[in-house]
Amino acid sequence: MAYPGQFGNYGNPETYRQNVAGNIASYGGPEIDTQLAAQMNAQMYIQQGSAMAPQPRRARRHKDAHAYDMSLTDAEPALAPVMSPAIPPSMNYPTPSTPSVLPESFSNDTNLLDPAALPSAPEVRYEDQQLFKNQIFNTMEKGSPPMSTTDFVGYEQGNSSSKFVQFTSYAIPATNDVCNASGIPLGMIVQPFAELRPDEAPVPVVDNTNSNPPRCKKCRGYINPFIQFTMASSKWTCNLCGSENSFNDDGFNPLVGSQHDGVESRPELNVGTIDFKVGKDYWIKEDPPKPARFVFMIDVSYEASSKGLPKVAAEAIRNILYGPVPLDPNVKIAIVCFDRSVNFFNLSPNLEQPHMLAASDLENPFVPFSSGLFVDPIASKVVIERLLDSFPAIFQDVKIPEPVVGNALEVVKLLLKETGGKAFVFVSALPTMGLGKLRHREDQRLYGTSDEKNLWNTQDKWYTSLADEYVTAGIGVDIFFTATAYVDVATVGSVATLSGGQIYHYSNFVADRDGSRLKQDLFRSVTREQGYRVMLKTRCSNGLRVSKYLGNFLQRTPQDIEFGSLDADKSVTVLFSYDGKLNGALDAHFQTAVLYTTPSGERRVRVVNYCCAVTSKSYDTISLAIVEPIVAVLAKIASTNIAAGSLKDTSVRLVEGVVKILSSYRKVAANRLTPGQLVLPKNLVLLPILILAVLKSSAIRSGSIHSDIRVSQLREVRAAPIQELMLNLYPNIYALHQLQPTDCLPDPENTGCLPINMPLCVRASRKFIEDGGAFLIVTGQKSYLWFHQRTSPLLLQDLLGVESLEDIDSLKALELPTLDTVLSVQVRNLLSSLRMQFPSMALHPQIVRQGLDGSEGEIFSTLVEDNTREGFGYLDFLTKIHESLHTQGYK
């Protein structure tokens, strides 16, 4: 395979484009209904009324903007739909080659009172998706990368794909003064194990187990596409620090023989993202890397059993071990459960039935046996399935209310300390017995006071000390909280946070309703790409230095951060500061290296490379600023610093961040602006609404928010990838009653990256949520299917096969029936396409019926453009920003 890059022939993007187009059908998968589109196209040519005409699937003709008009029912007539403004013309983003050209501005001066005239996040996202629908994003091309919510195909040409790394601006200020003048925070967000589309080229793997990867002798940066050859190509100059290195030092010279053959055959000199397989010099204490071991640790106390958790967990584990996606054949698993004791299962393939042995010592947990504890799930399939079959019955009569969570976490350490690996722990109640026992400290009287932040910090250092031991041993843990009462996520969850794992919090868990979501979350947690025994370090050009890392990890030194495990759905934010001046004649270079062990037991280094232009003008930095990374960096800084301040202080700093950026823009563009206007740079047109969404998030907003919910969201914000964070802040809302005949169906002429025609979303405001409508709401963590109380019975029948909202059980998981209607096919196709685009997200929608379900409050919290008791509406927030700009004197 030829890798396009900096040297010689860059490869043929057209060939790659054709290969991608040829793979679209396979990417769509069997869940996308392609039959309907062909059937509808064929019927267009059949004379109406012909006896030969086939019977089409039932479809409703659109009336006005509605596919299901309320005039067909006896209910009150629906209000006239609020029409969104037309999609604006394509953005003309400035490019690094012409950084002095200012972006076009958005002025809202003419009609401030019209909500439809405000910048629309759905329209900007839709336009960006259409821009990249039929073209490949080449990483060395000029222009801005696709938005995180855009489904696109990336083609690496030296720089890593924006799926792996994004910068707040692609014009790096040469000095600290220029950076401050721009108002743009200088940072990047790296997602080293980001998942690629099946039709994208996988990350190349270079085998250096016998000879180490070539590295700079001075800064220890890894060889990459941006090095320069010197001295008749026998030496190379490091693009990070400028030092000269010899190829012979590493037994590596790509230019032996012809230059074309040598460089083109080396992926590390052509693509931005690379994996190096490394040898014993990269081992930990000369300990050979071992295949991962997975531990499923299940709470079976009374609270868990009464909620049906053992049954849900057993079904989820069965699907993981014997479902459609096989585990790495080298991985071994153990199943352990706990109530007041820790119960171990011997799953040896030589047994006919699993053997259980309980260890009830609360002060000194131990592992009572080793043989048969970790097993090959295929070799032990019979005995494992017998355990899973009987698992719910074994503990159905358990009446023990206190789970020894601390003992269970200590046992995880004992099980994995020699090999490293990953644990998946289910917790249903506050641990009040055994190691790490905690007290109930939730106190609503603290809400809104200076002492509320105490609820967000750990109450017992035992858990943070355990997390330190986890990281040392290469252990990561994901914790699934299914409690219906206070469980102290801040303390218990710190083990997951510091080890690089994840917190899953299911507030008011109901097995029938939330079980499908939990199963999908656990499946993703186990099967996504991940590594363990992880260390990460970012290097950058002379003149810059790393000032801070943000995320969920353990940091023992200023230079490196460590994880017990790191997976595809985690990001790390890197903030930079100046220790000198960048050379404006050269690019700024950045490299993140991640040392890790794969689940199969290979020691590797994943390297992510990127270069940006350097500028001495602040308006270049503003012109090439990208709104999503800016918002993400500001949100992650806020979620990290909030424990040292207050909710009010955090909100003030976020608003000040927006004002600083916009006031900087007014300074550099003063000669092009009309005094008194509120003007937004077009590339930052979504900055106010996204920051408003941060202010209204359950992580940051004031009000009576349970500390478990707030803490889980704060820690989610710190480590969430940009894509997930953006959808958490501003969801995609699909009006199902307005789907057009071609929406959510395959386009026979579509040669791009989308398997179906995606509809335009509606804005997150009650003004755009129509009476009688049905809406699919997709956030970064959860999805909802919301029905207005006057939803058409015809829609309910075509989508769910029911006659009324009362026929729907909202406490059970939604399973869309396969109906012979156009709407059924459209919605099932839509969900299938979204699951492929957002594999980390739980897309088993929770049904919410207006006026009938208590969870309706969750729906309203997603409508971030509206006024609430705790925050401004969109228009009022823009007014506040405008006033702040005038207060500072920028008129």
UniProtKB/Swiss-Prot annotation:
Pfam families named among the record's database cross-references: Gelsolin, Sec23_BS, Sec23_helical, Sec23_trunk, zf-Sec23_Sec24
Any single GO BP term: late endosome to vacuole transport via multivesicular body sorting pathway
Record keywords, A-Z: Protein transport, Transport
Keyword Aminoacyl-tRNA synthetase: no
Molecular function as annotated in GO: SNARE binding; zinc ion binding
Membrane in keyword set: no
Chain residue ranges for the region called Zinc finger-like: 215-241
GO cellular component term, pick one: endoplasmic reticulum exit site
Highest taxon of the lineage: Eukaryota
Protein family according to the UniProt entry: Belongs to the SEC23/SEC24 family. SEC24 subfamily.
Name listed for the protein in its UniProt record: Uncharacterized protein C4.03c
Species: Schizosaccharomyces pombe (strain 972 / ATCC 24843)
